[in-house]
Each structure stands twice: as structure tokens, then as C-alpha cells.
Amino acid sequence: MDLSPSLLLMLWTLLSVLVEEITGQKVYTNTWAAHISGGSAEADRLCKKYGFINHGLIFEDHYHFSHRAVMKRSLTPKRTRQVLLKREPQVHWLEQQVAKKRKKRDIYTDPTDPKFMQQWYLLDTNRHDLHVKEAWEQGFTGKGIVVSILDDGIEKNHPDLQANYDPAASYDVNDQDPDPQPRYTQLNDNRHGTRCAGEVAAVANNGICGVGIAYNANIGGVRMLDGEVTDAVEARSLGLNPNHIHIYSASWGPEDDGKTVDGPAKLAEEAFYRGVTQGRGGLGSIYVWASGNGGREHDSCNCDGYTNSIYTLSISSTTQMGNVPWYSEACSSTLATTYSSGNQNEKQIVTTDLRQKCTDSHTGTSASAPLAAGIIALALEANKNLTWRDMQHLVVQTSNPAGLNANDWITNGVGRKVSHSYGYGLLDAGAMVAMAKTWVTVGPQRKYVIDILSEPKDIGKALEVRRKVEPCAGMSNYISTLEHVQARLSLSYNCRGDLAIYLTSPMGTRSCLLAPRPHDYSADGFNDWSFMTTHSWDEDPAGEWVLEIENVSNNNNYGTLTQFVLVLYGTASEGLSRKFDGDGSRNVASSQSCIVCEEGYFLHQKSCIKSCPQGFTSSIQNIHYTLDNNIEPLLVNVCVPCHVSCATCKGTTINDCLTCPAHSHYNLLDYSCTHQTQRSRESPTLKDSSHDYVARTSNLPFIVAILSCLFIIVVFGSIFLFLQLRSGGVLGRKRLYMLDSGIISYKGIPSGAWQEEGFSESETEETAAHSERTAFLKQQSTL
């Protein structure tokens, strides 16, 4: 059989490659590298002379040649052509090129675990997935991140978990020992925690089961559901080793029966708070929570105080086809979604199982939360400085609503799609990791509390409460962009399940805080229950908030709303410039107690002005506002009035005048203004200089003082002279006269005068005669 030359060449090339692979022998190509002096012209001349092709410079005087007559791959070098060319004096070095084995140093290859190809939610080229492969390709697999599963224990010796098991992230709270191994039963009741653990950190490439999303993360477990669950048990679990554990994943909560309203008690609530404020060295523990499986009972996850907490990252479920599962609960506190089980024809979740087995039938929102915990571990590996709130911001900004089917998608005030069934959409691991790498930590959390009701309100068939809110810039509770919003309500109602409650933000986002629950016949109402929504994330809180409470039944129900406290959480990191009008002012609704001005403006009569008017001067005042029983300090640039005697001033006292009003004189010595008399109000003649005028006006107080003193002395002397003349006729006589009307004394005479001179003889006689007359009159009156 005749073979064409091209076919023979191809076969020879393939044979060369095969020999190379088997023996490791060198394979020579039809290219050379040469060091030739004389420039490109000389290199071209030599190539033409010996049949080479010049492919150009490699770098200075070094050229890349090839030869058509030489096979592209050969096991032996072509020495003849090389020797001939090398004899040329301009050729300093020549070498036939050898094919080298080089492999791409990819950091990612698909896991080889036998069940990996069944993990459709990790990698599905036909439909949407969680984009986990994109995160792996960026080099993140959870290394250095610690996740603990709060559940019924973890099978620490499972072959697909053992290599990643972390005893420091584990404990048995039920039996008070360090071993979280589940209690085995015939029904395998305590498999839940082991299944959740495998979703997060099942080991990769070990030939067992599938792979965890964060397959290099450390995984632990807390056995706390296999016994009496108390407030203390929950608190100890939530607070386990908070500076070692980064992420806590919980797929449990109160009964999903459509009638229960329950949440963390005092100790658990304190554990949450301590976790987010002290965990991870102050960055905050991250709590991932399953939103609940009460969909068939028309339950609301806003009646679950764990998923409804601002401290938890609440995760819902969607099916393989992107539909709302039959078990899913809708509520406004859900932040995002991952995949889980659906109808019978839809696939479920692959993970580790009890008794060192593997399962492909993990279901419910119990399966969704650990997938989210794994993705969060990847993001945390990309940036270990993320706070607990940073992580929620990343989830909001990167979650993808595409492909998720629901009839309640809306676009909120900042242009994001959000749903009560899905939150902001499907978690996207690749996008989260990419954003996490360059994420800048958000500003400190701020809290603004407004007590809305001044008196109880009858609910009746429907009740609407409106309130304009304007958080004030410069105050510690000022918020420019929202995160969580809570409506803390207390109300009585004879059938709680007939109520629907909505909250509409100033930017028009309407959150369903409570959907009707047909199985809830309770007459207990709500007692200071916090309904939370994430749907207004990043919106501006300023403006009118509207609370609606509606009786959806035809029954004549009755009840009273006794408390409505609006609690806003967010940041002031957006900057204040966009908050002010063009004139530097920020006006406040009349119901508010404050107004603030941009830097460079001054507060004056509830408006902002560039400079203070005449009669006022600028000042910084520490004003205290009373807000919801809290006294908040605020430093304000204000215009304060001058003293009444000043026209303009530098302060508020009488000695801070800069200029005086008309008909007043300015005193340069004490910077005061003195009001002129009517006589002195004549204008100075034109020939008088302003200096002479000021001098005269400044001497006036001294002249007035001197004249006043002289006047007082004259009056005093006149009175003294008059009294002296009346008492004795001359100044030298110091006598007292006894008259019928009594003793007349001059109080200015020293008391020593009575002792210096006694009575005269005539005065003694007059006194005796007077006494006799007095005695005679008394005797006559007696008769």
C-alpha cells in the first residue's frame, strides 16, 4: 500500500512523540538559535546561503532560524547543516532547539471524587450554579478558615471529614464533654450535623463521596440538639471558642408549624451580641442560619427570632429548576439563597452521611445554609479582615437573581432586585471571592431609634401609621445608608394569624413583615417583637416611613397597636455633601427637633446661612437633643445674638461689642456701647473730626461721675446745715429738745455727744414741769 510523504511525516512525528513519552529521549525540532554578528543583513545573507528561514531577533544579535528540509520533530540532530553554518566567522554560537515538556501550573483541576459529577449545584454547564469553580480557580478552597456546625454532632472519624476535623471547633454541650460524636440509633436520627459538615468541608480528591465547597477548611461540630435544648445550651454553643471559630452554621430553629412565635432568650441573645462584637478578635463571628421549612404550613420566618436577627445571615432555598420549594418560608429578613431539594424529579444534595457513608438525598433549607457557610469560608480566605457586616454587604452586592422564579421580585430604592422568597438572589462564590479581595471595610454600625406612637391606636380592619424621619448629620446616630431595619411592635389581637403587616421605606420599598398565617389562632398578639427587613439595604432612610396593619379575614377582629418603635441600622460612610441643598442647608420636617448645616454654614432661625446677620455672631454650641429617652450631644455652628447694647459683636457679653447702634457711644476701654441722652444726640459739626468726637464721647462717663459726686456732696451739706440750724441756731450747739410730741433726734450726730454735755439747769426745770403736767392729766382721766 502506497503512503503519501505527508502521511509518512505525520506517522514519524507521532512515533517521535510516543518514543519521547516512553523513553524520555530528546526530540529535536527544525528550528535553531544563532548568535551572529554583523546585523540583520548578515543574518539574512547566511540564511539564504544555507537554506534557513530567518524568523527574526530573539534579542540583540541572537536570531531564530528554521529549515524546511528538516522534519519538525526528530530523535537525532541534523549536524550537517549546523556544521556548515557554524563555520561562518560571523556565527559565534548555533544550537538546534529541543522540544521541552512544560505543563501549565494551574491551581485548579476538577476534583476526582466519585460523586463530584453529581454535585450539580457546584458545576452545571447547562444551568445556573453557585459558581464555586470560579472561586476555586482563583485559588481559594477555605484553607485556614474554621467552620463549626451547631447541630446533633459530627462524625469526626468519617473518612471524608477526618482530615479536616478540628477538635478546637467541637464540643458536646448535651453531655458536657469535648467529643461531638453523634449518638447512633436504628433510625439514624442524628445524621443531620454530619451531613451539613460534608457540604462545607468534605475532603477533595480522596476517592470518597463528593467534595465540600471549602474542602481545605477546618470543620468542627457542636452536639447540642440531641437533648434538652435550653437558653444556656444555645448560648454555650453560639459562644464556643469565638476567637478560633470563624463561621457558625445552624440549620435549626423553633417549630415551623405556622403558629409559633419564638426566638433566642436572654443568654442566647447575649451570645449573639458578644459574638459579633468580640468574636474573631473584634471582627465578629459569622452566623449562617437556615430560614426554615414551614412553607407547607404557611409559616413566616419573621416569626423565627433566629433568622429574623440582624446578627444572622439568613439563607433560603431554591430547586434545581430555580423554583420556590414547597417547604420554603417567605419573609423580609432572608438575605440570599442557595440550592437544595425540590420536587421528586429534581436532584438533591450530595454529602457525607452517618456511619461513614455518603448520601445524595440531603434536603430542605438544612442543606442550603451549609452551602452558604462554605462559600462564605472561601470569601473569608480571600480577605480575613472582613467583618460580620462586611460579609452581609458582600452577599447583598454579589447575589444573583437571574434564573430564580418567583412572583414577588421587586426593584428596591437603589435598583437591586429583591424577593421575600430569595432575598437578593443566588449566592455567587466567584463574585464574592473577587469582590472580597479588594473590599474596604464598611464604617461603624449606627443605630437610630424612633418611638413612633404617642398613644395606642385601634387596628380595626386596617391601620396605617406614617412618620417622617430625618436622622441628623453630626449626631452619633446619623445614618446615610441603611442596612437592617426593624419594626418593634407590641399589639393585641384576637386572631393573630389574620394579620398582615407591611413597612414601606421613604424610597418606596414595601416589605412584608408578616404574611397571614392561617394556622395561628392565638390571641396573644405580639409583645415587643422585632420584625426585620433587609429589603431597603443601602437606601437613604430620610423621609416618610409607613406601617400598615391589615386584617385579611372577613371576621370582625379587634385589637390595639400599643407600640411601634422604628429601629434603623446603617452607616454614615457615604459622605454628607449629597445630603445638602445648593445653599448648604438641610431642612428638617417640622416634627423633628434638629437641623444641621454643611461645613462653612451657620444655623440661624432653622435655616443655614453663609454668615451671621447684624446683631448676631458665630459660635459653636454643644446642644443636647432628647431622642427616644436618649440624650445625644451635638456640636453645632450657630448664630447667637449680641448683647442688646451692641450693633455687631465678637461675643455675647456687654464688653464684646464691635460697633454700636445709632444714638450710642462706643467705649474703646471696655468695648461697650453707652446710650446717649437727648441733649447729646446733636450731630457733631462738619469741622469736628471723628477722632475728637470719639474722644468726647469716651470722656462723658467720667464727667457725669464727677458731677454726680459734687451734687451728692452739696445735697448732703445742705441737709446737714439745715438740721444744725434748726437744732441750735448755730453749728456749735449740740442740744436736744424735749417736746410734747416726743424726742426728736438727728441720727447723724455721734452717740458720744450725749455724754460730753449733760442737761442745763433750765432744761431740767422744763422736764420736771412736763412730768407734773403729765401726772395731772393721768389723774384727771382716772377720775
Curated annotation (Swiss-Prot):
It catalyses: Release of mature proteins from their proproteins by cleavage of -Arg-Xaa-Yaa-Arg-|-Zaa- bonds, where Xaa can be any amino acid and Yaa is Arg or Lys. Releases albumin, complement component C3 and von Willebrand factor from their respective precursors. Residues 442-574 form the P/Homo B domain. Pfam families: P_proprotein, Peptidase_S8, S8_pro-domain. Residues 106-701 are lumenal. It is a single-pass type I membrane protein. The chain crosses the membrane at residues 702-722. Residues 119-433 form the Peptidase S8 domain. Its EC number is 3.4.21.75. Its cofactor is Ca(2+). FU repeats lie at residues 585-618, 636-679. One of its GO terms (molecular function) is metal ion binding. Substrate binds at residues 152, 189-190, 234, 251-256, 262, 290-293, 304, 306, 366. Gene3D superfamilies: Galactose-binding domain-like, Hormone Receptor, Insulin-like Growth Factor Receptor 1, Chain A, domain 2, Peptidase S8, pro-domain, Peptidase S8/S53 domain. Residues 1-24 form the signal peptide. The record marks R105, D106 as: Cleavage, first. Ca(2+) 3 binds at D256, D299, E329. Residues 25-105 form a propeptide. GO terms for cellular component: endosome membrane; extracellular region; Golgi membrane; plasma membrane; trans-Golgi network. Binds 3 calcium ions per subunit. Disulfide bonds join C209-C358, C301-C331. Residues 723-783 are cytoplasmic. Residues 746-749 are annotated as: Cell surface signal. This is Furin-1.
